A protein has these predicted regions:
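Phosphate-binding glycine-rich loops and their immediate beta-loop-alpha structural context
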Residues: 1-64
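Short glycine-rich anion-binding loops that position phosphate/pyrophosphate groups of nucleotides
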Residues: 2-3, 67-70, 143
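Thr-Gly-centered strand-to-loop micro-motif
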Residues: 7, 38, 64-66, 89, ...
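Residue-level "edge-of-site" marker
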Residues: 41, 69, 93
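Catalytic-core segments of thiol-dependent peptidases
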Residues: 60-69, 84
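Flexible glycine/proline-rich
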Residues: 81-112, 118-120, 124-251
Length: 251
């Protein structure tokens, strides 16, 4: 995006510093993958196309941040459709709703149609010779810092582990007792940042880290897990048991 500043650049009105690149780089490095950093791509379709074509030739997976919403300068999803296919876009979750997943075809391969096997089964991330030759899986993450971390942990990390041959790639969920009331409407999955502790009786307890805005980095810094409030769930009362995705040791 044109609004992205690299570290060391002077601040300017309407611009934000590039924090997501360093977050994703750290998460990927911890997984043990080889990272190819292509830097910041400006809001020009031609530049984005060139970057995607280059990345699809060099990598098994492409991860972007921003450009997947509905703004005039959000070209990522359009370019995904032009150069490959979109398996899904927009998820009933918070934070991270505008996430997109698809595939970018490499040179010499035609883009897949919406009825392709990949579009029909977005879980088929297992890497093999055929899929590697035909391009790269693309994860279009949101632009908000917390949404980037949540979507990486919930979607990207398990998918990459599958591509690496791991059979147990899904993050484990623990049960903990909520020590506070949490407001939640049914109809979407919410990942609230939380702190898990051990109660006097040895049971796991969890509380939120406060403001859950998708741009509030402090909510993630203070957390050691994500409180997973499932699609069907409503309000959580004090004493209710909830699922927690613990990421201490992951981040």
């Amino acid at each position: 995006g044109d609004e992205i500043l690299s570290l060391g650049e002077p601040p300017r009105e309407g611009a934000v510093y590039d924090s997501n690149r360093y977050t994703v780089f750290g998460l990927l490095t911890r997984l043990g993958v080889e990272v190819i950093d292509l830097g910041v791509v400006r809001d020009e379709p031609a530049l984005l196309e060139a970057a995607f074509r280059d990345a699809a030739q060099r990598a098994d997976a492409i991860i972007t941040s921003g450009g997947v919403s509905v703004g005039e300068a959000d070209h990522t999803r359009t370019m995904m459709k032009q150069l490959g296919d979109v398996a899904f876009w927009r998820i009933a979750m918070r934070p991270g709703r505008p996430m997109a997943v698809g595939r970018i075809a490499s040179a010499g391969f035609q883009a897949k149609s919406a009825s392709s096997p990949y579009a029909e089964s977005a879980s088929s991330y297992q890497n093999n010779t055929a899929s590697a030759a035909s391009g790269a899986v693309l994860f279009g993450l949101p632009g908000n810092p917390v949404a980037v971390m949540v979507t990486f942990l919930a979607f990207v990390r398990p998918a990459l582990l599958r591509m690496m041959g791991c059979t147990r790639a899904a993050p484990p969920l623990l049960r903990a007792v909520s020590t506070e009331a949490i407001r939640k409407k049914p109809g979407r999955t919410e990942y609230q940042r939380g702190t898990v502790t051990t109660g006097p009786d040895g049971s796991l307890q969890v509380r939120t880290t406060g403001n859950q805005g998708s741009g509030v980095l402090s909510s993630m810094v203070q957390a050691n897990g994500l409180i997973v409030l499932h699609h069907h769930q409503g309000n959580v009362a004090v004493g209710d048991a909830v699922d927690v995705m613990v990421f201490e040791g992951v981040i």
